[in-house]
């Protein structure tokens, strides 16, 4: 059976044509799926015979909510979803003045091994399907009662390590007959799988590419991000430059401030050099505490000094607002906690 929620309208139309059904039915079905229906019987403008025929050929992906945590501080919501095979992923809904943002996962686990991240503990289990990523958006919207206006692929997993499925998810969530979320309202985060940068640039998508840099030199970056081995910061910055030249889209450098690791004035000066070269925005991230990791966030004094150096160098810099600190909102924390409890 085929996963119909992972199909675009033209693909549904082609399948319907083989069943002797008119093309316009594809749009109806796609719109029903975008509303989050879980069975063909809910598609009330289709005949019973067609609904039965669809049930024999296709399945509709579903999620089951295992946990929901709501921050008493800022209303951030964290969901833990169970997938059809029993695995679990996390999704976070964040409320801003400009709208509601959902942070989705792209993989079950992660193999990139970043030393400060909870998502990599336990490694990669599997890639998420396009329909499962779409479900993260649809189910979060339904359960929270909040219309989602922005998507960030910054949850569990490395999106570029699941390239084809992520590209199809983007086509689905961007489709005007579906969620219709514009590409300019979508950010994709990567730890730097530079072999995929040119492929992404060739798609000419208007999304924001956020590069999880976290250190401006090989010595520091290789210690905390194994993905740097065999690539290197120089090659990563070169890839960013090519991406910027090809797309005209400004890149964001994500930079978790880690006490005594990557927060010295020398780090700030080198980061400024890289950012100026590719016209990148720098987003500094106060490090989230992870029980299994020994790292601590930079002190407020070090953070302020770091910002001053970047600003004096002419770099556009912001500090990420810390949301959901009381609900395990750092990606991977809730999933691991529940998995440990089950074990």
Segments (PLM) and residue ranges:
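Short linear Ser/Thr-Pro motifs
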Residues: 71, 105-106, 119, 189, ...
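Canonical Radical SAM [4Fe-4S] cluster-binding loop centered on the CxxxCxxC motif
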Residues: 95-132
């Amino acid at each position: 059976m085929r996963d119909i929620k992972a199909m675009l309208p033209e693909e549904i139309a082609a399948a319907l044509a083989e069943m002797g059904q008119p093309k316009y039915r594809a749009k109806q079905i796609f719109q029903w799926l975008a509303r989050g229906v879980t069975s063909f019987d809910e598609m009330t403008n289709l005949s019973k015979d067609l609904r039965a025929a669809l049930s024999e050929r296709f399945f509709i992906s579903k999620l089951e909510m295992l946990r929901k945590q709501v921050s008493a501080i800022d209303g951030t919501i964290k969901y833990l979803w169970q997938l059809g095979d029993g695995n679990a992923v996390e999704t976070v809904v964040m409320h801003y003045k400009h709208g509601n943002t959902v942070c989705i996962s792209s993989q079950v686990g992660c193999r990139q091994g970043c030393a400060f991240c909870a998502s990599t503990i336990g490694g990669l289990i599997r890639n998420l399907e396009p329909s499962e990523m779409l479900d993260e958006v649809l189910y979060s919207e339904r359960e929270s009662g909040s219309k989602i206006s922005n998507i960030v692929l910054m949850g569990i997993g490395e999106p570029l390590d699941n390239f084809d499925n992520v590209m199809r998810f983007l086509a689905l969530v961007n489709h005007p007959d579906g969620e219709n979320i514009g590409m300019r309202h979508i950010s994709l985060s990567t730890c730097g799988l530079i072999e995929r940068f040119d492929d992404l640039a060739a798609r000419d998508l208007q999304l924001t590419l956020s590069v999880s840099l976290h250190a401006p030199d090989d010595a520091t970056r290789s210690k905390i991000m194994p993905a740097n081995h065999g690539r290197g910061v120089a090659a990563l910055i070169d890839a960013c430059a090519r991406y910027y030249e090809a797309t005209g889209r400004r890149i964001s450098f994500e930079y978790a401030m880690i006490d005594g690791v990557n927060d010295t004035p020398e780090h700030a000066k080198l980061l400024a050099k890289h950012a100026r070269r590719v016209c990148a925005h720098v987003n500094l991230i106060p490090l989230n505490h992870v029980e299994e990791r020994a790292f601590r966030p930079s002190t407020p004094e070090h953070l302020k000094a770091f910002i001053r150096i970047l600003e004096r160098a002419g770099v556009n810099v912001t500090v990420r607002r810390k949301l959901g600190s009381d609900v395990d909102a750092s990606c991977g924390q809730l999933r691991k906690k529940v998995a440990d409890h089950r074990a």
